[in-house]
Every structure is written in C-alpha cells, then in structure tokens.
Amino acid sequence: MFSGKSEELIRRVKRALIGGQRVMVFKPHLDDRYHASDVVSHDGKRIEALSVADSAELRQNLPDPLPEVVAVDEAQFFDPGLVPLLLELAQKGVRVMVGGLDMDFRAEPFGIMPELLARAEYVEKLTAVCPVCGAPATRTQRLVNGQPARFDDPVILVGAQETYEPRCRKCHVVVREPALKEGALG
C-alpha cells in the first residue's frame, strides 16, 4: 500500500511499449478506486487496462497471437484460476508481470499472492514509509473511523488513502478481540 506497486507496473509496461512489444494489461473489476478500467497509481500515473471479473474472463480476452507481455494489477483480488493461467502464459513465452499486496490488513497472506510469489522467477517487494514512525512500511493498516480494524472484519474492502495507510511491523495494529454483538451485555 502506497509503496509504488502500480506505479512500477505502469513503468515496466511503458518500457515494453517503447520497445515495440505487444502488451495487454488487466485488472479486477473490484478495483475501481480511481478509474473503472485504467490502472492508476496513487499519484495519478495511469495506463489503459482491461477490467475483468475473473481469470476466465481474462483468458477469454487474450488475443491470438498472444501478446508478448501480459500485466496484471491487484492480483490478490483474482480467483485461484489466475495462477495456472499465468504459468501457462509464461510457459508459452509471454512475459508476465504481476502487481499486488502479499498480505491483507491483518498481516495474513492475501489470496493467491503466496502461490504467485512462490512460482515467480523474479520478485521485487516494495515498501512504503510508515507515517507513524518513518520506518519502512511492509503492512497495510485498515482504519475504520480513524481506528484500527478488527481481525474479524471482512478481508476485501477496496478503498484509497482515507481507509488504509502503510505501517511498519511495530506500528501495525489489528484488534484481535471480536466485536461485541448488539445486546450481548444485556
């Protein structure tokens, strides 16, 4: 979160385009924070993308012949079918670039990212800066009404800076006690 993942993906895609390569960029429908279809970084850099519901729709939108580069942003939001699809593309000689969060707001492995990371030839883990202490931030802090979220809150809740901020290990807080149910005290 705020480490420049989308910005780096955009930079790499633009380099491939400058090199004359055929490129396709995909993102999940779920990510509509800044634009319905473009991949957009927090600082406004953007590149055209195709927004898809799942890995099956991504596969259906791959042209024949295949592009030389396929890029996927926010991969943590995709279904498990994305993993074998990207492996298949790589096996066919397509350069695959993926951006996504490795951990959710609870600091737990996020969706399909652990498997994608394990199977990648190259992994570059970017960090932000913790706004609390200035240390490298490797975690995503979810804030609800300015307070740290509870562990039992839903994992997927797409937002921008008003809902999330980067945190270091020391400053990352997740409330582990379950929320009291209404009427539980009474």
Regions found by a protein language model. Give the residues of each.
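Conserved P-loop
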Residues: M1-D64, D104-E115, K125-A128, A149-F151, ...
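Anion (oxyanion) recognition and catalysis
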Residues: L17, A90-Q91
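Short acidic/histidine-rich motifs immediately flanking catalytic phosphotransfer sites
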Residues: D64-V69, A75
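Structural recognition of the conserved hydrophobic beta-strand(s) that form the central parallel beta-sheet
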Residues: A71, R95-D102
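Conserved ATPase-coupling elements of RecA-like P-loop NTPase cores
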Residues: E74-L89, F105-F110, A179
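Short basic (Lys/Arg) and small-residue
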Residues: A120
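Short recognition patches in nucleic-acid-associated and regulatory proteins
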Residues: V129-I156
